[in-house]
Amino acid sequence: MSYLRFDKTLMINLQESLPREILRTNRSGAYHCTTIVDCNTRKYHGLLVIPVPNLDDENHVLLSSLDETVIQHGAEFNLGLHKYQGNHFSPNGHKYIREFDCENIPTTTYRVGGVILRKEKIFVHHENRILIRYTLVDAHSATTLRFRPFLAFRSVREYTHENAQASRDYQLVENGIKTCMYPGYPELFMQLNKKNEFHFQPDWYRGIEYPKEQERGYDFNEDLYVPGYFEVDIKKGESVVFSAGISEISPRKLKQTFESEVADRTPRDSFYHCLKNSAHQFHNKQGEEHYVLAGYPWFKCRARDLFISLPGLTLALGEQDEFEDVMKTAEKAIREFINGEPSSYKIYEMEHPDVLLWAVWALQQYAKETSRENCRQMYGNLLEEIVDYIHERRHDNLFLHENGLLYTNGTEKAVTWMNSTANGRPVIPRTGYIVEVNALWYNALRFVADMVREGGNEILADTLDAQAEITGKSFVDVFRNEYGYLFDYVDGYMMDWSVRPNMIFTVAFDYSPLDRAQKKQVLDIVTKELLTPKGLRTLSPKSGGYNPNYVGPQIQRDYAYHQGTAWPWLMGFYMEAYLRIYKVSGVSFVERYLIGMEDEMTSHCIGALPELFDLSLIHISEPTRQEAISY
């Protein structure tokens, strides 16, 4: 039985099928994303969504959807599905679905009377193109397929509406057409692998709604332009391939291209293979530069997310070359930042105070997976430069105090991963001595000291160790409270007593200022108050301001973002901490916990982990939104 298969009963029940979504990407940052019944419910959904660099730094929906119609004996059966005003869905093509399977590639099987039609979609890896193969599995009379493309040509953050500026011009190409609605956009080529008839019948389909945007309090309707439709005859056993891309392709190559792309895929036939496939989706190549996107569908390459996620996305999969390729770009961006030069790389938020420390942590994982000697040869100079940059107090918002701790101003702008804002201000103004920033600092000092000592630089190693001694003593004095857990941040006489997961890093890191008994106390409190089946809570239910309900308009969600929701990415560090305390005896717990996460592969964003969980009903609030740090 297929690992990711959904039967007719689930598919025709929109309450079950609409919340389940699929995402496929390529390394240019383009993607295809929709629900498993091909009904778009978000403005970010689309069949072909691509970056258009000459316009802006956003992705753009070119082809929103493709409605198929099966025609026999003059009778038409439309397989499309859109939501309109008043909870009205049309043309209700989901009622013909017999099953949906995405173990290999997303495959939908329709049954219309005596017709069985299989639709398979694949997003091409190395160019901005989606291919859809239709196979007539069974039919008892002459059959025609009609394809009606719904065009948007707009940013994923905007909507399009009927307007006179949209160009209706098109030109015939081999077995298809090319068209472009607005200046600055690339031409969209829509072709089939066999001869067909294109009927030019331009029209706007008005009032299409996106209920997920409505839930968030945003505008939620738009008009989509349909230039006409393609018609092609198909025989029993025959396959027809539809292509949409930004360059022309030879129709004779479409079947071969489809087959080669399928052969290149790793099936999502297990929990591990699902995670592996999802991990690969965050890689982004732009010319010679290699980035890691923070998440889909809207995040760009953010520095903190890059360094936290990079070991899991590469080294955990045995992909050392990929790690080095990304770090080659990241290292250049780091040096530009350290030298005060304008950024020429698309890695955002490099100025955040914990970013360089997370970079050291990422390189520490590289040293563990390869060797310290290899890490020293590759990145030894960079590690020394980062620590020196911080130690010499050259960072604009990272101040090394005499007590050895790093002080950060986070009152006006969010400066850590808990970065939600409302009305231009941090929802959680973490400021002063921040617990994970100083845990990272201690870890970096000890790690780099050991590295340079092994390289023969005893003087620098002794200097860093001396600094670590001061930092470690102050860390315990400042952060550890009478109840055995750690303050989340301390600013003068203001101590944040909230029980948050950021203290777990101090137990998880290779070097910690806490002794074993102190580590166990921290782990016990995190386990008791923050551990859930879906990740660590961002705030204990016993702490003031606890709110696990990530629902409603965006402003309401912003306030709840880090106030009780559970985040899967934190579990990696929790498990590291658990194994440091319980050693081999803790392995069975880790295994059981991971097995409990496997049911997420068939919920919400299929085959992937979500960014966060709403814990009020233990369900996912952001099913499509995937973050690289979750892997």
Model-predicted segments: where are they?
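Glycine- and aromatic-rich loop/turn segments at beta-sheet edges
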Residues: 280-297, 326, 332-348, 392-426, ...
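Single conserved hydrophobic/aromatic residue that forms the stacking wall/gate
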Residues: 618-631
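Glycine-rich phosphate/pyrophosphate-binding loop
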Residues: 200, 204-232, 418-427, 431, ...
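Terminal accessory carbohydrate-recognition/targeting modules of carbohydrate-active enzymes
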Residues: 1-267, 271, 297, 304, ...
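Short, solvent-exposed segments of well-ordered alpha helices
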Residues: 224, 228-231, 293-300, 346-350, ...
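Aromatic-rich carbohydrate-recognition surfaces in CAZymes
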Residues: 138-139, 160-163, 172, 234-236, ...
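Aromatic (Trp/Tyr) and acidic
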Residues: 2-82, 189-194, 220-221, 418-431, ...
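Catalytic cores of carbohydrate-active enzymes
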Residues: 273, 391, 398-401, 442-550, ...
